[in-house]
Amino acid sequence: MLSALVMWLLPMGEGPRFAMDGALALFALVVFAPIAETLIMGSVLLILLRLVGPTAAVVASSAAWAVAHSLAAPLWGLIIWWPFLIFSTLFVVWRGRSLAAAFAVPAAVHALHNLAPALAIASSPSG
């Protein structure tokens, strides 16, 4: 919904392009990216939580991911901050239970979040 709204408000914006299709797209977007990004995000959050409170750490993390994703497609950052706000919040909340859960839960939610777009990319003829 958020991406559709941004694209409606700013139709000149271009979304990210993925130079892959089929099983590679599914693996990259549903397995690799969520695990790799969660490992990076969680490590940064663990450092931030030593320096600032949980709210500031979550906001800083999601803002950093928005900037990082904007490098690939400028408008993508406007869209991606929200999911990373959720992923970062999940990490901080589940960290109270266990470090393994703090990494596993956001990675699983991220994978599910990426599943529908990954299926669309994987099934498109041009990737």
Show where each model-derived region lies.
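Transmembrane helix-loop-helix hairpins at the membrane interface
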Residues: S3-A4, L26-G127
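Membrane-interface helix termini and inter-helical loops of multi-pass transporters
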Residues: W8-A19, S126-G127
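Loop-to-helix transition at the N-terminal end of transmembrane alpha-helices
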Residues: P16-L29
